[in-house]
Amino acid sequence: MTITMNGKEYNIKFGNKAVARAGFISKLAKIGVMQSDPDDSVGAIEGMEQMYLLMPQIILAGLQANHSDEFGYNLTTGKDRDEQLGKVEDMLDHFVDEENGDFLKLQEDVTNEILHNGFLKRLFEEETAKAQDQIQK
């Protein structure tokens, strides 16, 4: 998956280690469940709000494989993660505010990438099932 921000193309690849350390799959599944009920406008709004908070973490994880020179951090210890996350947040702010980027389209593209990527698809489906079970209880 390739995204263009600040006039630069970034090749997003969700590697296993970066995704596992980022811990966003279960959060993303819960957001999907919140947004899936067409009669729950509050859940949809909360889901959108949570997605705004989560997107920088997802993008940062996806940047680790091909752009660690610019956005890399120690995946084992988390050293420098907050600094790199801040850079991604600034990049997303610029994308939305200055470039008139479509955040919802970006969210859709990233979610589709996760849903169609082999190991991520399976993880996402498992976490979605867990989230649905928790909501039904």
Which residue ranges define each predicted feature?
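Compact, well-ordered interaction domains used in eukaryotic information-processing assemblies
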Residues: 44-48, 52
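Short, structured coil/loop segments at alpha-helix boundaries
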Residues: 18, 50-51, 117
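Extended alpha-helical interaction segments
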Residues: 1-24
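Short, surface-exposed, low-complexity cationic segments
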Residues: 16-39
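Short, hydrophobic/amphipathic alpha-helical patches that form generic packing surfaces
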Residues: 53-65, 108-112
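Poly-acidic low-complexity segments
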Residues: 13-15, 51, 102
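Charged interaction scaffolds used for protein-protein
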Residues: 1-9, 31-45, 70-137
